Amino acid sequence: MARIGFEELDFQITPMGEISLRRRHDPHLGVEVFEVKLNDEYLMSSLFTVAEEELATLGLAAVSGDALDVLVGGLGLGCTAVTALADARVRSLTVVDALGEVVGWHERRLLPVSNTLLDDERTRLVVDDFFDLARRERADDAPRFHAILVDIDHTPTHRLDSTHADFYTADGLRALARHLHPGGVFALWSDDPPEAE
């Protein structure tokens, strides 16, 4: 059996640990596969993007109106962000990622969707801690969003960092709601099914 090799496109030490972006060719599928690893854990793969795309599709489908301002928490491979841009109602897309290294991958156009993101004037990539942003009091002149789409942690209980825990509480979600327009939508990607009420 032939071994499938990979090319490491980037490797960085971050406050969250070692992060790497890898590319490999899958001979069985005939496609280039992009993967992100944090320490020894696979975070994402371009082979499995349906859930990230559906986060944007379903989240925006729940929003009425036009000229939508959208915030995406977590950039990663860019699948959620690019899917949001496909909705013609999106006026602006702000994508927040805590790791400048991840934003840098797109600025260096290392990923297949990087050109789509960067060449669209509606897109703004921001290096910031999404969870800290969600906790902040909203200044009077700060923007509100019609939709906030979050794909950062694996699940509300399997988090990339322990400091994210308070976001997944009633108080954390109330704080986030300050950043939404009235009637706005918050959508969350999780690797687990919804919990029983």
Task: Write out the residue ranges for each language-model feature.
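Short, basic/glycine-rich phosphate-binding loops at helix/coil junctions
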Residues: G30-N39, D153-T155
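N-terminal auxiliary segments of SAM/dcSAM-dependent transferases
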Residues: M1-F34
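The AdoMet/dcAdoMet-binding core of the Class I SAM-like
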Residues: T49-W189, P193-A196
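Short, surface-exposed beta-strand-loop junctions and turns on beta-sheet-rich folds
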Residues: P27-H28, Y42-L43, D140
